[in-house]
Amino acid sequence: MAHGRRITIFDTTLRDGEQSPGIALSPDEKVEIAIALERLGVDVIEAGFAISSPGDFEGIRAVGAAVSAPTVAALARTRVEDLDAAVEALASARGRTRVHSFIATSPIHMERKLGLEPPEVVEQARFAVSHVAGRVDEVEFSCEDATRSDPAFVAEVCRTAIEAGATTINLPDTVGYSLPDEHAAFLLEVRRLCPELERATLSVHCHNDLEIGRASCRERV
């Protein structure tokens, strides 16, 4: 993630990495990895998806108690129960805390997965951010499947999230769909359409489906 000339590292090994086949980390294993990440100087550690299981909830709490330098983040959908679980899991953290909420913005995901119209998605983004803003140190909001979304609609969602209190906006290539130059052009277009992004940290999340994950990160930064 970059804000001006500052590049920060958001590590999601303990959340997205744990979705790899055959991987299930205990709270103690998450703590061991988190301590190593802290020693490496990682800025943000996404410790888990609090509502998904008691183990993930406890993993977030354990990581928050074990590290102090990195910000510890918990993932949440835009549902109130997700958001409250994330806040609760972070309540005893030693360092800075972040709730990372998300909702899909691509036409296919809005229609087939969410069953929502675009205005409803915008309202859910507003609700999610405003529900946790002030209860944790930072709020991140992601437009899931951003690269298959209309840039103008993504800009609207970003604007709404920032006005509600989001400090970081993430525009991920959720399904590993775009080439590096395509995602970079998409980011530039969204920034043009949403000048409010100057008030937030802009984040990218790249997948390696096409075996160009590292190249994608470099191009998008």
Residue ranges of each PLM-predicted region?
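Catalytic cores and adjacent flexible loops of soluble metabolic enzymes
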Residues: 1-220
